[in-house]
Amino acid sequence: MSENQSTATHKSIWDRAMDDVTATTNYAYLVNPSERIIEDAVKDVYDRGDVSIRMLASEQRVKSALDAFFLKAQAAEAIESDMMQIRTAEIPTVSFVVSQDTLNTIISVGETATIGELTDSNIRADLFRESETEWETGDEYTIRSPPLSRVQDRLAEKFGESVRDDFDAALERDIAVDGVILLLLLAAKHELQFYQMGGCGEDLGVGSRATFSRRKTVLSEAGVIDTESVPIDIGRPRHRLLLNDSKLANLAFPDLIQQVKRMIEQE
């Protein structure tokens, strides 16, 4: 039987489910979540740091939900820190969060979601056991992104705190942006060498040098960035990335990203 049913934003619903879980434990299964719940779960687990969530979902849904670089990097951080694990499997149509002591169903509709607490201990025990079984046979989902803190630390170490500060400002605004585009715009904003940022991004696993070159072409053709040669003693000249417009250069970094996204979409 369901009781205490309520409707609110996805984040509020997720917060309530987690408050129920953490009242007695820090370990639960999240089964068949919607894309919005996946997003909120990743952000919340990353911020809480004191929970262990096992997510069971379809591969396509997880891939779609974690498309944005910042969210993907937060998920990678949570996984590396053992706060979250993700596996894909054939799963039931109902969405729920279950621990040994609590069971909440979650229904997502548009911009809102509904949560219902199920108090029948037999149903809860059955779903917990079924989730354990599905988990054991599920396929581990690999996130092809470096953990967020690794990116932050490397940017500060290699390029300075001001570069990391701009990265963090974009993170704070939760801007959905491709990771390679993000790093190229950081480089152009701070007039860094393309070779250095491309190498850093490749070492981190954000993208290959070839991907950085392709994205640079996209930004150049959209009129966003330009380059200037940087002479070196030996070998081919390197190129420094520059923003092509003083109006772009004067924008705060999060606003720069948003403006560039609009410019690319118009191409």
Residue locations for each model-derived region?
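Primarily the HKD phosphodiesterase
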Residues: A17-Q74, I175, G179-G207
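Signature of lipid phosphatidyltransferase scaffolds
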Residues: I107-L171
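Short, cationic-aromatic polyanion-contact patches
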Residues: S229-L256
